[in-house]
């Protein structure tokens, strides 16, 4: 039986022989023209379900890749059972992050971008009651949740701390075995040999991503210095450099439609979080707060204050920090949706999914540069922030769409730099790699949308990242709730402050 990989793998591991390493690129030993193609907005932003990109979205994609490959094998018709081994961090916090459920959803043929929340919540009870796994391809096989999924936190594979192995059998015969590594942000690597000490690694990629990786970028960069040099030589902004790279691999219509989809999904997550009440799952009894906070802020926005009240900060128009309350609301709403296992945008991870939507919400609600008619625009937005049009229907809508696209493209550049040269995986580098990265991306995006120069945009990201260093990944009970939800709100406010600090300077700074 041929057990060699038949999965769609591209983009050899960046650390393999002959490929420039991040250290060599940072040291200036490799020119930009020889650096790997920068990661895309399609890489840095993806739609999925909570609560974790590395522990939920990635394992679900791994399960789907395994089932897709397995269904194409001739022995699939004789499939009798499947086992799942979760190693390292996946084994340690997998229960709190629903890693087991995520892998089973993937094996059942579901994708994190499109699976319904009803299916997500019903699959485990269905398997537990029937003792059968509805496998992709229409088959059902016996499955015991207690014995066929093993949590092995003390076993850490050599390539990455987030690893899982899925094995399929026909009776006593091995049909297929694959080991996957969920390396953060929903990115998944597949092991293509059977040597655990010297694994050969390749990334799982869609056909669209494969096409993009094979197309040279007109403005390649792997460091901030290279990015700024490309901007200086071309006269383009950071967002324009990223857009040009994107358009070398896909059409403008496809790019803009994807950016619209990402923005709408972020705004819908805000609205969903605001409209939901109750206790978050997992056993910590953490109550949702966004709904009550939204009601309080709306009441304050509509209240008629007395003359004495208006002399204080109680008057909504007199409160100099009123926007901060709405930013906090947006971040809390998204991260409560993530903690509930609902649909959000991985940006760049699920644990940090509330930062960029919160700052994006600030941009469209409070900034005239994005079409907001401040101070007349009411941030209470009773119609819902997700209903704000992103089209050519009006000057403000067109301005809003352009600002959002600039924001997301500049954020992509910063996220790509961090992912290439460091890590966005909390299990690998702590929360500085998740919330810190998201704060830096959001700061850069906001500075770009507010008209910052490339140097100011880079400086905004640097300020936000510098003051996120040292954050640990310390979720209580292995759940993405405490301190994660509040930490997103703090990071969003930090991003706005970083952008404003950078915009008052000329972009020159000491730390890089």
For the regions a language model picked out, list residue spans one by one.
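Intrinsically disordered, low-complexity terminal tails and inter-domain linkers enriched
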Residues: 5-31, 370-399
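N-terminal signal-anchor module of multipass membrane proteins
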Residues: 34-49, 65, 81
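Conserved phosphate/anionic-ligand binding catalytic regions in large, soluble enzymes, centered on
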Residues: 45-65, 339-359, 429-440
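Alpha-helical support elements that line or immediately flank enzyme active sites
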Residues: 54-71, 357-369, 443-451
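Beta-strand segments within the central parallel beta-sheet cores of soluble alpha/beta enzyme folds
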Residues: 75-88, 371-382, 389-391, 395-413, ...
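C-terminal regulatory domains involved in ligand/effector binding and gene-expression control
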Residues: 111-313
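Accessory "access/gating" subregions that flank catalytic or transport cores
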Residues: 252-374, 396-430
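Hydrophobic alpha-helical bundle architecture
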Residues: 399, 410, 416-488, 501-510
